[in-house]
């Protein structure tokens, strides 16, 4: 299955970010804690070079806690400031302002020596579609400053948000990159909802998810759907359809409905806390 989604507005958004980065002290990059590496746009490292960097691993409530701890150590070792959080419940949000100040302390000291007082840290918030940038900004600012939605591509245009005397945020549209060199990256992005479902083969996506869960989280499908995990992936999807009574009007099993149900329940955390990639595997 081939994954690719790079609509024209993303090219325009990237050009705007390249222009706006000149105004920025700090790049705050949101990633999905279930796929912390695959949900990083590789263009951001080039865009944000010579800028202070903070990685926020959002949706940590849906991710495997041990994996999140390992990813946090992985990124810190590479020189990033890192926070794991759940922007929706605000869990993990309290420390962010202090970490922003810590990350930018050299800049603030330079300002002080130059006699520049009370100039706020300017941070650009970046991330791929559907990682929760708008929800993070709304939670952080304490009010609905940015549009939110559960479909990739909702936030558009330039938005500066003054959080306090100390911090200003520039929200940016979620952008992917033109080509996924590794189709496993595309698969993971599709599973978390960063690629529009309308262009995906949901049945094949569900089969890939079942294959992963059988090997990495054995027993989770049996517990949720009362299926026998020794079966083939397609047979397991059939079992899920039977368990959840996914039936067509003609009385046949509705595999597409079962596939969509499985993916939705994974995305919503109903299967448990699951991470789709681990740092030690990436290093091999």
Put a short name on every predicted segment.
Residues 51-61:
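Active-site cofactor/substrate anionic-group-binding motifs, chiefly glycine-
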Residues 61-126, 145:
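Canonical P-loop GTPase G-domain recognition
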Residues 107-111, 138, 144-150, 216-221:
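Short, structured loop/turn "capping" segments at alpha-beta junctions
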Residues 87, 137, 167-170:
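Conserved active-site beta-strand-loop modules that form the wall/rim of enzyme catalytic pockets
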Residues 122-142, 146, 172:
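Glycine-rich phosphate-binding P-loop
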Residues 1-26, 34-43, 47-53, 66, ...:
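Helix-rich effector regions associated with P-loop NTPase G domains
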Residues 31-34, 60, 140, 173:
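Anionic group-transfer/hydrolysis microenvironments
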